């Protein structure tokens, strides 16, 4: 499939022509009244569940989702994860105000290729009118499979304006936002939530039921409160309770660092789908591994060094083809490189070199040097080099959890 258009290009005439067509025909946007029907089997294993049908195409009984992550789940990474087994991907979270004002930085993040489908577009905001208008524009111009509302972001800048998890302090507002988005699109409207604003207001079942009552077609739960941010453990028991309390599909999210975690979440909670965020960093093959476990097959081994480097370079070339600024793209890609080399011998030294690159050619050169001179790298490690015990910290200040993205780890 061809890659999506480079960033920085204009919307062109598509929006105006679709809007004109709507005015001419008097088209009225209505919420789709029924879900598409899919045949769903029980999960292989000791525990069986009756799965809820999703309102958009999914290829497996228990779909695997790539979480929306600011600065990470851009089109190239979404495409890569789809190739490695993700059933559904979601855009970075996007401001409804930015969309309706056609801010080019925001609009550029809405672009996706045909090979990314099934895809959802995630929007956030506390102004129902802005959310409705943004949903209408996204539907007309970009036509994803569904629109997701962000009620999970704990970022101060977002919640200060009552967006993201800030909405959870007012369930009437949550319902108003959901109904407004539904009024702006014929696509399924889904939500991503946290367990509440604070421990005192913690009630994920009440929140999920309110979302369902307003018309949400799917709910994804990250079982932490906003005040928890990323501390403590995600309370998977709350996913199970929400799953029992509502009649729409429930996606589990939070603390999935490995394929085994994804399998364990499904077993413990009965969730209809599993959403992976940080667990995909530097290992997009986690989806193939999780799929094998969910289907009762032996989990494939993680790629060796050479294959891992090949996947990283494939990712780099996809980014290079997508971004308009090659040097800026290479610098932005440094964080991914740090994740790809995590755990390798002398990975701290390797990461240090990779975090200084200014071009994708430099990346290939460093990888080639590592593969040709492994004995030297290992000797350097013996002389004091270390593995990558600190790679997780490399995300600090680099990747924001603007959709509950890092919260979905």
Question: Whereabouts are the PLM-identified features?
Answer:
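Extreme N-terminal basic, low-complexity initiation segments
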Residues: 2-17
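Active-site beta-loop-alpha junctions enriched in small/polar residues
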Residues: 69-71, 94-96, 124-126, 152-154, ...
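Hydrophobic faces of well-ordered beta-strands that scaffold small-molecule active sites
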Residues: 64-68, 89-91, 119-123, 147, ...
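Alpha/beta enzyme core
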Residues: 132-163, 172-248
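Alpha/beta catalytic cores of nucleotide-metabolism and tRNA/nucleoside-modifying enzymes
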Residues: 47-65, 70, 75-76, 184-186, ...
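Glycine-rich, positively charged N-terminal anion/phosphate-binding segment
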Residues: 49-58, 69-145
């Amino acid at each position: 499939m061809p890659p999506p258009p480079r960033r920085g290009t204009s919307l062109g005439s598509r929006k105006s022509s679709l809007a004109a067509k709507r005015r001419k025909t008097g088209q009225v946007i209505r919420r789709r009244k029924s879900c598409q029907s899919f045949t769903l089997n029980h999960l292989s294993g000791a525990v069986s569940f009756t799965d809820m049908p999703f309102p958009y195409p999914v290829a497996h009984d228990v779909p695997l989702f790539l979480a929306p992550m600011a600065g990470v789940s851009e089109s190239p990474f979404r495409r890569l994860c789809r190739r490695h087994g993700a059933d559904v991907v979601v855009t970075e979270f996007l401001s409804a105000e930015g969309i309706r004002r056609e801010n080019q930085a925001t609009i550029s993040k809405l672009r996706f290729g045909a090979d990314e489908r099934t895809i959802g577009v995630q929007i956030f905001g506390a102004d129902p009118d802005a959310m409705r208008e943004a949903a209408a524009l996204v539907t007309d111009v970009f036509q994803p499979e569904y629109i997701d509302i962000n009620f999970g972001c704990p970022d101060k800048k977002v919640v200060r304006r009552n967006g993201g998890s800030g909405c959870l302090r007012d369930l009437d507002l949550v319902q108003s936002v959901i109904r407004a988005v539904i009024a702006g699109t014929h696509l399924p409207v889904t939500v991503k939530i946290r367990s509440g604003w604070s421990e005192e207001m913690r009630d994920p079942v009440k929140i999920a039921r309110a979302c369902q009552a307003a018309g949400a077609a799917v709910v994804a739960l990250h079982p932490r409160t906003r005040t928890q941010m990323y501390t403590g453990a995600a309370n998977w028991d709350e996913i199970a309770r929400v799953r029992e309390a509502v009649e729409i599909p429930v996606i589990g999210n939070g603390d999935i660092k490995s394929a085994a975690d994804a399998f364990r979440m499904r077993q413990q909670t009965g969730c209809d789908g599993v959403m992976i965020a940080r667990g995909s960093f530097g290992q997009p093959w986690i989806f193939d591994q999780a799929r094998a476990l969910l289907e009762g097959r032996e989990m494939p081994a993680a790629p060796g060094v050479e294959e891992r480097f090949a996947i990283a370079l494939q990712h780099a070339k996809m980014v290079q083809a997508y971004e308009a600024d090659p040097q800026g793209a290479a610098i932005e890609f440094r964080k991914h490189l740090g994740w790809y080399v995590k755990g390798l011998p002398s990975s701290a030294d390797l990461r240090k070199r990779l975090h200084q690159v200014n071009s994708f050619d430099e990346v290939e050169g460093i990888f080639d040097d590592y593969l040709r001179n492994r004995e030297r790298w290992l000797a350097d490690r013996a002389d004091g080099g270390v593995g990558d015990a600190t790679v997780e910290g490399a995300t600090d200040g680099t990747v924001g959890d603007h959709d509950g993205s890092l919260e979905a780890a």
